[in-house]
């Protein structure tokens, strides 16, 4: 195992402050050549997106794309790398666009360890869905713009571009009629931000997330980051890119350790670790909480994440899945995740009725739902929601909208719409 899980203090405030200085250009890594994956119906793709997505910032940054172009001369577009998988017959109308969290890459959805159990992409293609699991900007084999420009808002703008390309047949030559955004952790933050602004997906599934968070555990994780250039694996990343320090991931903060295979812990540490940017850290607090830019709240603080004009503006069917052992987003002593009904009650007040908000809790699971022994149950729960809302053929949306309002929004009461796993 490459890293031993322990906590070490490195000053999280310094991480946030670092983003302000990270407008320094650095040589960008071009994405590696496209290769066919050994998995049936899967292939890796490099998708161009305009550098103008970097202009989308909480603090307006006009001309940010000009800086990105200067860093990567002759290539005006950024590149998003991802793995597109289709069902065996190749006939599908609904695609899932999957977004990983910080310090991960698309491998979170494409696990190679016991893939029949832990591989989300395989599970969903077997269920009839297509899936495009990407490396977000700054991670994996996607472009590495200047760190301060790779923020939550820029990631959301990039996802908006990809949704349009999936609908128009510009990714893999397949025109998809329906798109489901699926997020994990920071990928869920990106999903909420993108949808609150564009509402261009047909449904969203978010995992390991919530509308309030425990700041102490989050600061503990932030304190384990170090400059990526100190890690031999990431020494070519630009200044301002971060990764886990020598002590690695705090396993007790990411897993229910009573329900995880030790071999999975080793696999995750050696195969799935990746980078994040100081810009992503710095944009987290002010974008989702009433916190001034650059300020880090105290460790004992429980903060509400969404500003009213954000999640309240989501108008597509929304699903949130957390584990009972979620330490970051389930409140003090995980009180918000004692049951699916309690998580529904806690979270629905942050959404309008148009979101048809649903929530589910996975027992004996922590932050890394896809990597726990009961990952198949989490996958089944997400698939059941997708089946009810859309289905692989995308035909169920009108019916779902007509029946879901009974338990959505602030009106938490029994309604006619149900789904099996809950």
What are these regions (language model features)?
Residues 89-132:
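Short, surface-exposed "cap/lid" segments of acyl-processing enzymes
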Residues 171-185:
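Alpha/beta-hydrolase fold nucleophile elbow
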Residues 1-30:
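Secretory targeting and sorting signals
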Residues 324-362:
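Conserved loop-alpha-helix segment in the C-terminal half of the alpha/beta-hydrolase fold
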Residues 149-172:
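Alpha/beta-hydrolase active-site loop
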Residues 362-374:
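Catalytic histidine-centered segment of alpha/beta-hydrolase-like enzymes
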Residues 224-338:
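Alpha/beta-hydrolase
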Residues 33-91:
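N-terminal cap/lid segment of alpha/beta-hydrolase-fold proteins
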């Amino acid at each position: 195992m490459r890293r031993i899980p322990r906590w070490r203090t490195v000053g999280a405030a310094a991480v946030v402050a670092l983003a302000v200085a990270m407008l320094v250009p650095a040589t960008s890594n071009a994405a590696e050549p496209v290769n066919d994956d050994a998995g049936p119906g899967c292939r890796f793709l490099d998708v161009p997106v305009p550098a103008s997505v970097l202009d989308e910032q909480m603090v307006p940054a006009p001309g940010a794309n000009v800086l990105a172009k200067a860093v990567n001369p002759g290539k005006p577009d950024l590149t998003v790398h991802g793995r597109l998988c289709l069902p065996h017959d190749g006939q599908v109308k609904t695609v899932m666009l999957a977004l990983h969290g910080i310090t991960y890459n698309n491998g979170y959805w494409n696990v190679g360890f016991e893939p029949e159990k832990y591989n989300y992409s395989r599970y969903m293609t077997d269920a009839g869905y297509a899936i495009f699991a990407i490396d977000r900007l700054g991670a994996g084999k996607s472009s590495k713009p200047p760190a301060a420009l790779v923020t939550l808002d820029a990631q959301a703008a990039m996802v908006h571009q990809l949704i349009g390309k999936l609908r128009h047949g510009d990714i893999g030559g397949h025109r998809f009629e329906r798109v489901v955004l699926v997020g994990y952790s920071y990928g869920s933050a990106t999903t909420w931000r993108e949808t609150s602004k564009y509402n261009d997906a047909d449904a969203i599934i978010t995992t390991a997330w919530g509308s309030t968070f425990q700041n102490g555990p989050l600061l503990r994780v932030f304190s384990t980051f170090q400059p990526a250039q100190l890690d031999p694996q990431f020494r070519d990343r630009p200044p301002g890119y971060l990764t886990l320090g020598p002590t690695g991931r705090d396993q007790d903060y990411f897993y229910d350790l009573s329900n995880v295979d030790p071999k999975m812990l080793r696999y995750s540490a050696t195969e799935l670790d990746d980078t994040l940017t100081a810009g992503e850290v710095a944009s987290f607090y002010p974008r989702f909480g009433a916190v001034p830019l650059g300020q880090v709240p105290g460790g004992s603080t429980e903060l509400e994440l969404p500003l009213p004009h954000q999640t309240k503006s989501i108008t597509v069917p929304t699903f949130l899945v957390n584990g009972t052992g979620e330490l970051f987003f389930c409140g003090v002593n995980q009180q918000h995740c004692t049951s699916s009904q309690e998580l529904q009650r806690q979270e629905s007040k942050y959404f309008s009725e148009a979101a048809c908000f649903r929530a589910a809790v996975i027992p004996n699971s922590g932050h890394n739902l896809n990597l726990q022994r009961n990952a198949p149950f989490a996958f089944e729960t997400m698939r059941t929601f997708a089946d009810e809302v859309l289905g692989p053929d995308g035909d169920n949306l009108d019916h779902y909208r007509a029946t879901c309002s009974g338990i959505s929004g602030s009106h938490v009461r029994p309604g006619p719409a149900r789904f099996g796993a809950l």
